[in-house]
């Protein structure tokens, strides 16, 4: 068409019309093939939004009853990284071309999922969820960390394809405020002893407050593909863990694989079910987007069980770290971290006000990312 357009001036009007028609037809075909089937219809979108609005009202009333002015909410499974914006709740997951590299570095160090221009709630632990003031989690099924939440409420909506779906609102048992005091030497210790994400989190709780205890205890592994539900404590881990019968297992793999699959032998994964009011039992669990290297939560596994980690397409796993979470130590550390909270009295998109009582020599740790234009007074 372009050749004819250049060589036949008399046909230019007709050829211009023909090119516009071809482009229009192609756009229409693309929309029908790739656009319409992959997105929610208007009715389904509207119904889902109403359900989330109901839960937003419920969680706000619950937070108000506890005099909590600021908190964050997350989804156990994302539709997009910007679900918070879509459903009108404050979250830490975001997709943005102007995302700060420093925020990504922090997420990476703590084992949270990141990509080139996005960061995510995936990879969270009870500590990191609490550090980001995540008080509620929405899920269309079970919560991501069943040992650490309680069921608050639910809302149902009609699906466009027929039937209905239910969204559950879970409340974390321990949520730190937007800011709290830590020892002034804590940041330097974390940076000087940086390692895998579990080491980073242990370093934080043991250095941020006097008397802090390690919340992750190392397990036996072959370093790449196999985990045994038995302790292999580090030299500086003095916890007495004898008699442990069930291990709440987390692991982290360095790999370029798209998918990781954890398979349990000599036992099974047994987690509390809030939806069916029973215990869910399985022998395998799959983790997607594993090439973005984040902490994977396996769940409760009995002592002595063996967990095999396999990567998709026979991709190599260059390193693997596996730890069991210590709920008792976390309860103890949480109370220490929450001893000197920043009490938010009011907030908006441009201003946060609150009160804090402090002695000299402490740092105010907040989950407010630094950005030019913000000031403290």
What are these regions (language model features)?
Residues 1-3:
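Membrane-embedded alpha-helical segments of integral membrane proteins
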Residues 16-362, 367-374:
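Soluble catalytic regions of membrane-associated enzymes that act on cell-envelope
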Residues 5-20:
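Membrane-interfacial entry segments at the cytosolic side of transmembrane helices
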């Amino acid at each position: 068409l372009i050749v004819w357009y250049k060589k036949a001036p008399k046909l230019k009007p007709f050829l211009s019309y023909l090119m516009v028609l071809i482009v229009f037809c192609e756009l229409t075909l693309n929309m029908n093939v790739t656009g319409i089937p992959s997105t929610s219809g208007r009715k389904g979108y509207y119904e889902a939004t109403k359900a989330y609005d109901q839960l937003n009202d419920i969680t706000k009333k619950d937070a108000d009853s506890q005099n909590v002015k600021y908190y964050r909410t997350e989804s156990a499974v994302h539709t997009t990284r910007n679900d918070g914006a879509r459903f009108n709740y404050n979250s830490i997951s975001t997709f943005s071309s102007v995302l700060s590299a420093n925020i990504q570095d922090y997420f990476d160090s703590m084992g949270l999922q990141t990509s080139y221009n996005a960061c995510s709630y995936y990879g969270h632990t009870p500590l990191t969820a609490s550090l980001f003031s995540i008080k509620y989690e929405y899920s269309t099924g079970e919560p991501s960390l069943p040992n650490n939440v309680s069921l608050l409420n639910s809302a149902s909506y009609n699906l466009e394809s027929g039937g209905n779906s239910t969204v559950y609102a879970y409340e974390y048992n321990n949520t730190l405020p937007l800011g709290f005091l830590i020892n002034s030497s804590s940041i330097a210790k974390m940076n000087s002893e940086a390692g895998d994400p579990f080491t980073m989190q242990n370093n934080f709780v043991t250095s941020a407050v006097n008397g802090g205890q390690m919340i992750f205890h190392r397990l036996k592994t072959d370093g790449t593909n196999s985990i045994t539900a038995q302790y292999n404590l580090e030299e500086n881990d003095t916890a007495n863990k004898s008699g442990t019968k069930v291990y709440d297992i987390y692991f982290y793999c360095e790999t370029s694989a798209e998918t990781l699959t954890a398979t349990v032998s000599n036992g099974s994964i047994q987690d509390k079910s809030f939806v069916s009011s029973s215990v869910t039992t399985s022998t395998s669990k799959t983790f997607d987007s594993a090439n973005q290297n984040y902490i994977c939560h396996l769940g409760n596994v009995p002592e002595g069980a063996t967990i095999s980690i396999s990567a998709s397409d026979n991709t190599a796993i260059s390193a693997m770290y596996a730890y069991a979470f210590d709920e008792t130590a976390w309860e103890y550390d949480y109370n220490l971290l929450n001893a000197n909270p920043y009490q938010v009295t009011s907030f908006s998109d441009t201003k946060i006000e609150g009160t804090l009582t402090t002695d000299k020599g402490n740092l105010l740790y907040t989950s407010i990312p630094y950005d030019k234009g913000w000031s403290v007074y």
